[in-house]
């Protein structure tokens, strides 16, 4: 999978992700993972498999983890929701993404975050948690 390193912000913090764009305006998926997970671990594996199946994927480090800014190793549930909304914004605003076909996939603890984000962000059209 060929992914581009991207940066975006949430609450003034810089977040870092890996964006793999599929051809032809394919649906897009943002992935969120386990408690202390980073984009190179389980969410990166899921992203690679989904991209192989023709989806645009964004795996990113939440605030305080991996390459992203913020207080190190601090679990901030409201902050993670803001991070997800910002990630959805990045996807929805990308010229090669159909903003009406953005989904969220949450793995482990990320499942709860994905469902909560989808409940409050109408740009998320499908969710797997």
Which role does the model predict for each range below?
Residues 38-39, 65-99:
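Catalytic nucleophile-loop/oxyanion-hole region of alpha/beta-hydrolase
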Residues 49-69:
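Conserved alpha/beta-hydrolase
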Residues 5, 33, 53, 102-104, ...:
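Glycine-rich phosphate-binding loops of nucleotide-dependent enzymes
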Residues 11-13, 53, 93-94, 120:
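Conserved dinucleotide-binding and phosphotransfer motif residues
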Residues 86-129:
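Primarily recognizes the serine-hydrolase "nucleophile elbow" in alpha/beta-hydrolase
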